[in-house]
Every structure is written in C-alpha cells, then in structure tokens.
C-alpha cells in the first residue's frame, strides 16, 4: 500500500480521535471516551501495522495536551487507555497465553498506578489527602474494581476484534482501497 494512503488514514483516525477526546469535558464521558478512542486505533493497527497505530496515538495525545480536554481523562488516555488496545494485539502474538495474560495484567496495574500518581501528585486532584485510612481503602478499592473493569474491557476488545474481522474488515479495506487478502 502506498504511504500516502497510510498517512491519510492515520490523519483521519487521529482527527476523529482528537474530536472525540474533546468530549471528555462532559463528565459522563470522562473514562468512556478515552477507551473508545483507544478502540478506534485498532483499525490502523490491524490494517496498517502497530507503528502506524502508535503514530495515531501519539498525534492524538499531543493534540489532547494542546486542546482544552479534561486533564484527568487525558492522563488515563495517555497512560493506559490509548495505547492498551494496540499493545494487546502485540502481546497476544506471544505463544504462551498465560505469559500474555500475566503481562497484560502487570501492564494494566502499573499503568493504572502511574496514572493515579500523576492525577494525584501532578494535577493535585486528591480529595482524600487528609484522611490516610480512607485514601488507602479507596486506592485498594480502585485497584480491585479497576482489575474487574480491565477483564471486561479486555474481553470486549477481543470480541470487538473478532466482530471487525467477520463483519467490517472487507468494507474498511475497500474504503482504504486495499487488496482483499482474506
């Protein structure tokens, strides 16, 4: 495929992702929109390769820093939800399914702790700063609920990828003017 088609495709997906990130200013979309934008980059990853999907992720991240997006959502997008769907595809290419699951779980927990560190220490959004016990209980609760949400998110990504291959890939490839290699 010509590089102009790849660049144009990345530009379109980056623009769409950036516009969606602007929706994080609406409180109900605080965590859902960054997850959806990350899912959006599965198409460039599956059709063009991981480096092009990471390019879309990088462009959207930089534009999110420049434009007026909700900072907490942007931290979650840059630190976890934006790159995870791309990394998931790369991790699932490993031969050992157990190693892949352990690696994904470790990546998620490290990224989640890092995101919350940035949110609390850099952005200063710690509402339980003076209450040590409550903050500890809250942190453990967030990790537990976050891991449950991660499992659901990972399963949903897998099913979404399967649905893409079954129902939408042919149309996307036609729109991108790619030869059908199915």
Roles of regions detected by a PLM:
Residues 7-12, 32, 54-58, 74-75, ...:
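Hydrophobic alpha-helical transmembrane segments
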């Amino acid at each position: 495929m010509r590089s102009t088609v790849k660049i144009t495709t990345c530009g379109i997906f980056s623009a769409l992702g950036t516009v969606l990130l602007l929706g994080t200013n609406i409180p109900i979309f605080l965590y859902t929109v960054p997850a959806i934008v990350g899912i959006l980059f599965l198409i460039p990853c599956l059709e063009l390769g991981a480096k092009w999907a990471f390019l879309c992720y990088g462009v959207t991240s930089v534009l999110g820093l420049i434009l007026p997006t909700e900072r907490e959502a942007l931290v979650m997008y840059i630190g976890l939800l934006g790159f995870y769907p791309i990394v998931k595809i790369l991790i699932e290419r490993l031969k050992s399914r157990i190693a892949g699951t352990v690696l994904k779980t470790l990546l998620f927990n490290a990224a989640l702790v890092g995101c919350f560190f940035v949110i609390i220490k850099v952005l200063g959004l710690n509402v339980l700063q003076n209450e040590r016990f409550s903050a500890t209980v809250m942190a453990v609760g967030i990790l537990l609920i976050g891991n449950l949400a991660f499992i659901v998110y990972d399963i949903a990504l897998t099913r979404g990828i399967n649905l893409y291959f079954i129902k939408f890939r042919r149309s996307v490839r036609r729109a991108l003017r790619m030869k059908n290699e199915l």
